[in-house]
Amino acid sequence: MARKLSVILILTFALSVTNPLHELKAAAFPQTTEKISPNWESGINVDLAITTRQYHLQQLFYRYGENNSLSVEGFRKLLQNIGIDKIKRIHIHHDHEHHSDHEHHSDHEHHSDHEHHSHRNHAASGKNKRKALCPDHDSDSSGKDPRNSQGKGAHRSEHASGRRNVKDSVSASEVTSTVYNTVSEGTHFLETIETPRPGKLFPKDVSSSTPPSVTEKSRGSRLAGRKTNESVSEPRKGFMYSRNTNENPQECFNASKLLTSHGMGIQVPLNATEFNYLCPAIINQIDARSCLIHTSEKKAEIPPKTYSLQIAWVGGFIAISIISFLSLLGVILVPLMNRVFFKFLLSFLVALAVGTLSGDAFLHLLPHSHASHHHSHSHEEPAMEMKRGPLFSHLSSQNIEESAYFDSTWKGLTALGGLYFMFLVEHVLTLIKQFKDKKKKNQKKPENDDDVEIKKQLSKYESQLSTNEEKVDTDDRTEGYLRADSQEPSHFDSQQPAILEEEEVMIAHAHPQEVYNEYVPRGCKNKCHSHFHDTLGQSDDLIHHHHDYHHILHHHHHQNHHPHSHSQRYSREELKDAGIATLAWMVIMGDGLHNFSDGLAIGAAFTEGLSSGLSTSVAVFCHELPHELGDFAVLLKAGMTVKQAVLYNALSAMLAYLGMATGIFIGHYAENVSMWIFALTAGLFMYVALVDMVPEMLHNDASDHGCSRWGYFFLQNAGMLLGFGIMLLISIFEHKIVFRINF
């Protein structure tokens, strides 16, 4: 009996010695510092799980680290590749949204959290969810393994290995809250992700602002502090979760925030053990979609709206003010309207307006009106997305957004290329035809001079013959007949100079240099830019070819029936007969409505972002410059003083401010209405550019003014290409244009 008792005591002593040695051996393993479970637990091969985790860590460090350490830059690249480096805005269709999410989680065997095809179950199954993320919370107070709520498989072994190592991350600053709220659409969003304030969940000697050095002793001390806090924390919420710590309902942790939230310095390279502490937070961000914003959620849209609203008011007011001051610029440029330099300037400005208007329509407004290039994923292959799950969307969201955006930009640029190609073809053909016509006229001119000389000689010869006949038949004619016959040649001779003078005038009209010198200044003064045509009489063939800057000053071709000096006086009388009051109301209402539409477009564009408002403002500025100059010239022609003209232009500009305010309110408070405003504005811009301005660029008579047609051609091409280039640069780099306003 005594022998049996001694054997039992020896075995008991041996077991008591073996267990501490086994725990010390497990603690020496680089990935675990505490062994709380046997090698086989609930059918899980713990050693295999640890080995597999070590393999995956080695793969990550091989790709992103150097010398068995991971730098902050490498960590940022890792976050970028898995798609959680910054906030992205996506749109998920409700028909397959829940099924896709459910299938993704079912692939990972999270059956306990997704049983009803809805993310509302996150709130109901929060206990299981938190146990999966923090499996060691009840390990000291309960003998039950919290992993039992999960499914079976290899994924569960990863949770088992993570369970033992979460205890090592004793810094209570590893706070990445995943509190979900139920929304009407059936989707969930991250409510709070914030490092808690020191003193609430942290030990008194631990602060997130000054993370301590990561050593084994400090980890042990923080472990004791964590267990102390764990004993007083709520069992349902867990020590790692905090509510109402941030006013912002969404936060995407970047590399620096993840490191500081875990009590790690951003300048210290990470080893495998330290990186192991960050893995639950990284997986948590992917699972919580904290770096994604669903456009179907109204709450998710609030932060960007608040930011863009400030930009919209400030940027829109500045843009409208600058454009409205163009009317004052007309006061300076009116004295220059009779000079050749002004013609070249207007030609360049009109071409620039065509380039910016069409470029803004094709490269910015139309792509933004579809709202697909930076707001959503592609829905062309929903079946593939459901099969691969939302994780596939997370990994490829950035590439999809950039490729889709630039795809729309290149397609718009291709459309502009087709427009520019047809402009070149028609313009070159017109120049060739005009060159041939001029050559023919130069060939016909000597022939007409020869005809005049021949007619002069014939008239002299006929007069001599008639005189000789008079002398021969003098005796046979009566006195009255002789008087009548003698008057015939004199009458013929008297009529001949009139005929010759008329022919000379006709020939001179073919190249009326002096007349044109008188007509051109009047024509430039009498035409003004507007978007409607008058019904006054049209000019003859000479005036038909004289479409000087019809795109700028084109609705007052007032009675240009012949290029004489009195036509200027007649046109001025017509303007005065219309009445100053009538013309003023026409400018205020017509230009006011036009300015209102411009302000509406600018306001809606600024609610979309700074780059969007900038591109639209540039386009409006370029086409309003010749517009305002033309309106100012017409008001002065009607007999107004400079002060009155400035006043009426200012009144019409006030409607632009009203349009801007309307566009901001619509774009900010009405969902998706700004996209329709973009589409409408694109149509207006295309009409003004292609219908009003391009035809007059093609049908100018620069050579009749002593100017080179090819000079105008190259100047117009330079203006159009410059406008295209400005809009293209804004379109490509608009996501990098950032301007913050802090009040």
Swiss-Prot record:
InterPro entries for the chain: ZIP, ZIP_Transporter
Ranges of the Cytoplasmic topological domain: 335-343, 433-645, 696-712
Compositionally biased tracts (Basic and acidic residues): 96-116, 133-147, 155-167, 227-237
GO molecular function: monoatomic cation:bicarbonate symporter activity; zinc ion transmembrane transporter activity
Modified-residue entries (Phosphoserine), positions: S459, S466
Membrane topology value: Multi-pass membrane protein
UniProtKB keywords: Cell membrane, Cell projection, Coiled coil, Glycoprotein, Ion transport, Membrane, Phosphoprotein, Signal, Transmembrane, Transmembrane helix, Transport, Zinc, Zinc transport
Location relative to the cell: Cell membrane; Cell projection, Lamellipodium membrane; Membrane raft; Apical cell membrane
Biased composition regions of type Basic residues, renumbered to the chain: 117-132
Swiss-Prot/TrEMBL catalytic activity: Zn(2+)(in) = Zn(2+)(out)
Membrane spanning stretches: 314-334, 344-364, 412-432, 646-666, 675-695, 713-733
Quaternary structure note: Interacts with SLC39A10; which triggers cells to undergo EMT and mitosis. Found in a complex with SLC39A6, SLC39A10 and with the 'Ser-727' phosphorylated form of STAT3 throughout mitosis. Found in a complex with SLC39A6, SLC39A10 and with NCAM1; this complex controls NCAM1 phosphorylation and integration into focal adhesion complexes during epithelial-to-mesenchymal transition (EMT). Found in a complex with SLC39A6, SLC39A10 and with GSK3B that controls NCAM1 phosphorylation.
Function: Zinc-influx transporter which plays a role in zinc homeostasis and in the induction of epithelial-to-mesenchymal transition (EMT). When associated with SLC39A10, the heterodimer formed by SLC39A10 and SLC39A6 mediates cellular zinc uptake to trigger cells to undergo epithelial- to-mesenchymal transition (EMT). The SLC39A10-SLC39A6 heterodimer also controls NCAM1 phosphorylation and its integration into focal adhesion complexes during EMT. Zinc influx inactivates GSK3B, enabling unphosphorylated SNAI1 in the nucleus to down-regulate adherence genes such as CDH1, causing loss of cell adherence.
Protein family membership: Belongs to the ZIP transporter (TC 2.A.5) family.
Protein's UniProt name: Zinc transporter ZIP6
Phylogenetic placement of the source organism: Eukaryota, Metazoa, Chordata, Craniata, Vertebrata
